[in-house]
C-alpha cells in the first residue's frame, strides 16, 4: 500500500471518529501539522500507526488498507469514496435515484437549503459540501467511465418526495425539492438518449430490493463500497454502517451480481421512455 493511501484512510477515519485534528494530535503527542503531513502521505512510523488505530478504534491492519473499512457517518464514508474515485478509471454502481457525479448545481443548492434547516453544525455542513463538490469536480476533470443502474422504485419515491427525501423540510421547500427531482430525472433521460462516451444508465424494473454499491476500478486494484447512505441525506444522519474493501471475494461476488443486473436491465430508448412515463405519473405538476 502506498503512503498516500494510508494518509487518505487516516483522514477518513479521523472524520469518522468525530474528533478534531488538534485533539488527535495532542493524544498522539505530535503536532497538528505532523498529523496533516501524515494525511498527505508522509512517512509514518508503525508505532504511530498502532497508537492511531487504538485512538480511532480501528484495526491497525484496516488503517494500513488490509481488511474491511467500516463507516457509520455519511461524512467519512463519502470522503473515502472521493479518495477512491480520484484514482478510478471505471465506476460501476447500483445507485440512488440519480448518479451524483452528473447532477446539476440545482441539486446541491436545494439539498444545502434543506440541510441548513435541520443541522446547526455549520462546519459539518461545509465539510459535507466540500466533499461532494470535490467529487463532482474530479469527475469533470478525469471523466472515468461510469455505468449506473437505477431502481424504478427509488425513482418513483424520489419524484414523489423530492431531493432530501428523509430530511424534514417546509412544504414550500418540499415543493421546490420535487421540482428539482423532476429536473434531474429529465436530465438522465436526455443523457440516455444522447449516449455520451463513457456514461451509461439503465433501469432496474422488477428488482424489489438492491443494495446500493459502487465498484471502482483503478490501475492497481478494484475497490467495493457498500452504502446505506444516500447522497441527499443529512450529514448528521447515523442510520447505517457502510463499508469499503478491496477483498477479492467481496469484489468478485458483487461484480458478478452487477453484470447480471446490467444484462437484464432496461437500457437505451426504452429506458428513456420509461423515465418520461414515471415523470408523467409521479412528478409534481
Region locations from a protein language model:
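Hydrophobic protein-protein interaction segments
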Residues: 93-284
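Alpha-helix boundary/capping detector
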Residues: 40, 50-51, 61-65, 78-79, ...
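Residues at structural and domain junctions
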Residues: 10, 20-21, 38, 87, ...
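Basic, Lys/Arg-rich alpha-helical nucleic-acid-recognition elements, primarily the DNA-binding modules
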Residues: 1-77
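Short, surface-exposed, charged/polar-biased interaction segments
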Residues: 31, 45-46, 56-59, 70-73, ...
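Short, charged recognition helix plus adjacent turn
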Residues: 66-97
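Short, well-ordered helical secondary-structure segments
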Residues: 6, 25, 31-33, 88, ...
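Alpha-helix boundary/interfacial micro-motifs
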Residues: 30, 49-51, 56-59, 74-78, ...
Amino acid at each position: 500500500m502506498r503512503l498516500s493511501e494510508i494518509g487518505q484512510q487516516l483522514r477518513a477515519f479521523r472524520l469518522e471518529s468525530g474528533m478534531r485534528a488538534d485533539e488527535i494530535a495532542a493524544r498522539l503527542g505530535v503536532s497538528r501539522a505532523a498529523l496533516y503531513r501524515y494525511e498527505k502521505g508522509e512517512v509514518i512510523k508503525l508505532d504511530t500507526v498502532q497508537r492511531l488505530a487504538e485512538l480511532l478504534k480501528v484495526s491497525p491492519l484496516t488503517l494500513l488498507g488490509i481488511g474491511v473499512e467500516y463507516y457509520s457517518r455519511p461524512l467519512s464514508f463519502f470522503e473515502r469514496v472521493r479518495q477512491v474515485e480520484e484514482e478510478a478509471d471505471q465506476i460501476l454502481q447500483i445507485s440512488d435515484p440519480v448518479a451524483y457525479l452528473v447532477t446539476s448545481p440545482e441539486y446541491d443548492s436545494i439539498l444545502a437549503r434543506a440541510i441548513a434547516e435541520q443541522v446547526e453544525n455549520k462546519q459539518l455542513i461545509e465539510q459535507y459540501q466540500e466533499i461532494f463538490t470535490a467529487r463532482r469536480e474530479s469527475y469533470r476533470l478525469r471523466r472515468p467511465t461510469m455505468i449506473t443502474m437505477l431502481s424504478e422504485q427509488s425513482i418513483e419515491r424520489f419524484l414523489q418526495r423530492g431531493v432530501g427525501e428523509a430530511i424534514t423540510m417546509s412544504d414550500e421547500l418540499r415543493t421546490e425539492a420535487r421540482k428539482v427531482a423532476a429536473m434531474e430525472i429529465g436530465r438522465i433521460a436526455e443523457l440516455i438518449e444522447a449516449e455520451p462516451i463513457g456514461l451509461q444508465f439503465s433501469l432496474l424494473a422488477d428488482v424489489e430490493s438492491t443494495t446500493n454499491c459502487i465498484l471502482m476500478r483503478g490501475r492497481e486494484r478494484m475497490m467495493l463500497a457498500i452504502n446505506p447512505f444516500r447522497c441527499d441525506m443529512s450529514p448528521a444522519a447515523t442510520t447505517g454502517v457502510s463499508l469499503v474493501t478491496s477483498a477479492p471475494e467481496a469484489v468478485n461476488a458483487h461484480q458478478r451480481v452487477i453484470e447480471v443486473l446490467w444484462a437484464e436491465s432496461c437500457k437505451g430508448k426504452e429506458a428513456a421512455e420509461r423515465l418520461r412515463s414515471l415523470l408523467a405519473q409521479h412528478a409534481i405538476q
